Swiss-Prot record:
Chlorophyll a 2 binds at residue 100. Photoregulated by reversible phosphorylation of its threonine residues. It comes from Zea mays (Maize). Chlorophyll b 3 binds at residues 155, 171. This is Chlorophyll a-b binding protein 48, chloroplastic. Residues 1-32 form a transit peptide. The chain crosses the membrane at residues 98-118, 150-170, 218-238. The modification N2-acetylarginine is found at residue 33. Belongs to the light-harvesting chlorophyll a/b-binding (LHC) protein family. The modification Phosphothreonine is found at residue 35. The lineage of its organism: Eukaryota, Viridiplantae, Streptophyta, Embryophyta, Tracheophyta. Chlorophyll b 5 binds at residues 163, 260. The keyword Lyase does not apply. Keywords: Acetylation, Chlorophyll, Chloroplast, Chromophore, Magnesium, Membrane, Metal-binding, Phosphoprotein, Photosynthesis, Photosystem I, Photosystem II, Plastid, Thylakoid, Transit peptide, Transmembrane, Transmembrane helix. Chlorophyll a 3 binds at residues 135, 212.
Length: 264
């Protein structure tokens, strides 16, 4: 939207004050700046937004805090610690949550699929997620995906340097405000970062945001479970699932928890 300034240039009024202007606009001023268009609000009938949205305990939920208005995806009206009361803190925490949700979704798939493929006869090296990285310290190094002629890593320092450069470049691009296409929200870049045009329809995009945050929160809990499983059982998630399905009585959280009872 181009910058604009209202002016009256009629020859009949040259040199004369526009008496009606103040009467119409009072003491206000009109300022128009170039900015990215704000996303349209979600449809009023959406169950995930607004004052009548779904709350964390459904009909048993109390009144949500006044600062949780249902404007953002994933707002179920639950904030017992008041973490969202300060707008700046809320904006920061919202960004952190969305980013960690995306990481958890991607990493969760990376923990499951290699082990699943390995158990079904696909040969590409170590399939268990917390053991795969240590292969770089073996004599032959680490090959992706189990083929030395493709990507063959033998130096942990080289991998660390690549991660710093690549991830640093991406984060620097994000923080500095660099963009490919018009940016409406730093968390949802759009433009060249949305080649499928998922954000073109505001109503559909609002629903996709809710799906992302819900699946992301589930993925973060899943990753926490993968970490606990790795520490307690020393096995990957697929093997733990197979063991539980084979013998659910002796392979469950309670059975493993009782192994840590003092004196047992």
């Amino acid at each position: 939207m181009a910058a604009a300034t209202m002016a009256i240039t009629s020859r009949a009024l040259v040199g004369k004050p526009a008496a009606g202007t103040r009467d119409v606009f009072g003491e206000g001023r009109i300022t128009m700046r170039k900015t990215a268009a704000k996303p349209k609000p979600a449809r009023s009938g959406s169950p995930w937004y607004g004052a009548d949205r779904v709350l964390y305990l459904g009909p048993l939920s109390g009144s949500p805090p006044s600062y949780l208005t249902g404007e953002f995806p994933g707002d179920y009206g639950w904030d017992t610690e008041g973490l969202s009361a300060d707008p700046e803190t809320f904006a920061k925490n919202r960004e952190l949550e969305v980013i960690h949700c995306r990481w958890a979704i991607a990493v969760g798939l990376g923990c499951v699929f290699p082990e699943l493929l390995a158990r079904n006869g696909v040969k590409f090296g170590e399939g268990v997620w917390f053991k795969a990285g240590s292969q770089i310290f073996s004599e032959g190094g680490l090959s992706h995906p189990g083929n030395p002629s493709l990507v063959h890593a033998q130096s942990i320092l080289a991998i660390w340097a690549c991660q710093v450069v690549l991830m640093g470049a991406v984060e620097g691009y994000h923080v500095a405000g660099g963009r490919l296409g018009e940016v409406v929200d730093p968390l949802y870049l759009g433009g060249s970062f949305d080649p499928l045009g998922l954000g073109d329809d505001p109503e559909r995009f609002a629903e996709l945001k809710v799906k992302e945050i819900k699946n992301g929160r589930l993925a973060m809990f899943s990753m926490f479970g993968f970490f606990v499983q790795a520490i307690v059982t020393g096995k990957g998630p697929i093997e733990n699932l197979a063991d539980h399905l084979t013998d659910p009585v002796n392979n469950n959280a309670w059975a493993y928890a009782t192994n840590f009872v003092p004196g047992k």
